[in-house]
């Protein structure tokens, strides 16, 4: 399994392949198209992320001490952002998720190319992932 550092380097290199942001947005749309999606039962108030302009749901499962995220959105670019975060953080331990600074978002320039409301939504998605991880750590103690 790849480390977070290896995943980050790979992701940054992947984004650098695309020279302009229209291509990068298309890459995000393509990533979002690869998401499995969630069942209607999983799309509920507990999994809905507050602070997003569009509807975003995030679910966290745990297997053998590692967290695996699944999610969905009703907006295509946001769905790609969800996929980006899921690809980055799935398979990490709760401690890794809590400690990670999500610096790759700045390194690829994503935050600066989103509207303020979408940027707030991105922060909310990161906070939800960290909240799941904190909950997991607390349940272990």
Question: Which role does the model predict for each range below?
Answer:
Residues 46-52, 73, 95-97:
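Solvent-exposed interaction patches of small proteins and small membrane subunits
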Residues 74-77, 84-86, 109-113, 133:
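Feature captures hydrophobic
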Residues 91-108:
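Glycine-rich phosphate/pyrophosphate-binding loops
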Residues 65-67:
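Hydrophobic residues embedded in beta-strands of well-ordered beta-sheets
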Residues 1-55, 62-63, 105-140:
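N-terminal intrinsically disordered, cationic/polar leader segments
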Residues 82-93:
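Alpha-helical support elements that line or immediately flank enzyme active sites
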């Amino acid at each position: 399994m790849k480390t977070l550092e290896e995943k980050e380097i790979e992701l940054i290199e992947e984004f650098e392949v695309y020279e302009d942001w229209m291509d990068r947005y298309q890459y995000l749309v393509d990533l979002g198209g690869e998401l499995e999606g969630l069942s209607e039962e999983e799309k509920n108030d507990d999994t809905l992320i507050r602070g997003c302009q569009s509807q975003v749901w995030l679910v966290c499962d745990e297997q053998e001490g590692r967290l695996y995220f699944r999610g969905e959105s009703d907006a295509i670019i946001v769905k790609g952002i969800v996929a980006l975060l899921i690809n980055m953080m799935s398979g990490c331990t709760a401690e890794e998720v809590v400690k990670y600074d999500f610096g790759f978002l700045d390194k690829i320039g994503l935050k600066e190319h989103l509207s303020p409301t979408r940027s707030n939504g991105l922060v909310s998605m990161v906070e939800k992932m960290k909240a799941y991880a904190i909950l997991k750590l607390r349940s272990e103690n």
